[in-house]
Amino acid sequence: MFDIGLNITSSQFDHDRDEMIARARAAGVDSMLFTGTSLEESDRACAFARRYAGCWSTAGVHPHDASTWNDESAARLRALASEPEVVAIGECGLDFNRNFSTPAEQEHAFTEQLRLAAALALPVFLHCRDAHARFLALLDPWLDKLPGAVLHCFTGTEQEARECLARGMYLGITGWVCDERRGLELRALLPIIPADRLLLETDAPYLLPRDLTPKPASRRNEPCWLPHILTQVAQWRGEDPAWLEAATDANAARLFLKNASPA
């Protein structure tokens, strides 16, 4: 099973990172993509991908950190993207919910990362929150120059999902869909996502599925819970879990591993 979104550099894993990876393996999660959210964290994510077999990483600047983008950022990302473990540019995009960086800073950093991904022929690992229309307006000119794109941790509306899917994008589904308070709209739209455009992720240590029983004492999410997300998504889509696992694994390999060196 392939978890396409694990925040491996989180300090929440500092005391048991090796054990967390071992638990994932024991649960059948044998492939993982580690998310880079800043230049420094992207470098660390790459180092961890080098350390753990069957793992890769992204390199990018999250919209929260867009204010750090400067004249040297693209060159540093380009150098990092030359590492065999790095298989996508991101996490990049727009987040107008918190605006930790200004909208102008976010749009500039996003556009420059799209430019870099196109130049390097790498897929993009995308973030969008409360910015759908502007997100698509900036993304659209680049889509035909990119080998692929996934909107990670999709939590939008059915209309937003359809607009992304019409552009050939993949949608990443997390344990958010297991939340009976705020995940019902996402759960209802699962059947409209073509099987060849669906990816699964935990976004660990965040977004622990609320319907886990018993819940882990730490309340921390881990990639070992990806099989639970898979089972629930398959049920709500009316599909066999083993079939959906094979389909989503194939999607992840097609998007991220076309040119990757064996991990």
UniProtKB/Swiss-Prot annotation:
Enzyme class label: hydrolase
Disulfide bonds: none
Family annotation (InterPro entries): DNase_TatD-rel_CS, Exonuc_TatD, Metal_Hydrolase, TatD-like, TatD-type_Hydrolase
UniProt keyword terms in alphabetical order: Cytoplasm, Exonuclease, Hydrolase, Magnesium, Metal-binding, Nuclease
Pfam families xrefs: TatD_DNase
Cellular localisation: Cytoplasm
Binding annotation for a divalent metal cation: E91, H127, H152
Enzyme Commission code(s) on record: 3.1.11.-, 3.1.13.-
Subunit structure: Monomer.
Entry protein name: 3'-5' ssDNA/RNA exonuclease TatD
Highest classification ranks of the organism: Bacteria, Pseudomonadati, Pseudomonadota, Gammaproteobacteria, Enterobacterales
